[in-house]
Amino acid sequence: MATQKTFVMIKPDGVRRKLIGEIVGRIERKGLRIAAMKMVKIDRETANKLYEEHIGKSFFNELVSYITSGPVVCMVVEGDEAVRVMRTLIGATDPKEASPGTIRGDLALSKAENVIHASDAEEKAKREMSLFFSPNEITE
């Protein structure tokens, strides 16, 4: 199995609802390692870059407003097949469709405020990590 790094972000509703410890614990119990972590307030410019694939879609402005509404916790998560493992761990975007035992299935309240983001591909993970972390901030 190949060790990968992926980008994970606890969204404003997860921070507001005090779910940081619960989510980090689930990631670590899955055998993944937190290689970097910081709490930040995302500005609109960074939000536009993070969600650039959604520019022009009907929900884009609402998404940017939400993600800039409060602090988020950004992480670089490392482990065997980290991208795939994290995507499975977080569950479907809509918590009504997310399996019990997944982060969204257990913790998310709505599709709009679904607690967590995780990169869906290795190249995307690299781009998203670079928005929030310099190489010297990521531990080996």
UniProtKB/Swiss-Prot annotation:
SMART domains from the entry? NDK
Report the main location listed first in the record: cytoplasm
Q: What is its EC number?
A: 2.7.4.6
Entry annotated with the keyword Kinase: yes
Which top EC class applies here? transferase
Q: Which UniProt keywords are present, listed alphabetically?
A: ATP-binding, Cytoplasm, Kinase, Magnesium, Metal-binding, Nucleotide metabolism, Nucleotide-binding, Phosphoprotein, Transferase
The protein's required cofactors: Mg(2+)
Q: Which residues bind ATP?
A: K11, F59, R87, T93, R104, N114
Signal sequence region: none
Kindly state a single biological-process term from the GO annotations of this entry.
GTP biosynthetic process
| Subcellular locations according to the entry | Cytoplasm
Q: Which Pfam families match?
A: NDK
**Gene3D superfamilies assigned to the protein according to its UniProt record, in alphabetical order:** Nucleoside diphosphate kinase-like domain
Q: Which reaction does it catalyse?
A: a 2'-deoxyribonucleoside 5'-diphosphate + ATP = a 2'-deoxyribonucleoside 5'-triphosphate + ADP; a ribonucleoside 5'-diphosphate + ATP = a ribonucleoside 5'-triphosphate + ADP
Write out the GO cellular component annotations.
cytoplasm
The active site annotation covers H117
| UniProt similarity note | Belongs to the NDK family.
Read off the HAMAP family from this record: NDP_kinase
Protein role = Major role in the synthesis of nucleoside triphosphates other than ATP. The ATP gamma phosphate is transferred to the NDP beta phosphate via a ping-pong mechanism, using a phosphorylated active-site intermediate.
Q: What is this protein called?
A: Nucleoside diphosphate kinase
Read off the lineage from the record: Archaea, Thermoproteota, Thermoprotei, Sulfolobales, Sulfolobaceae
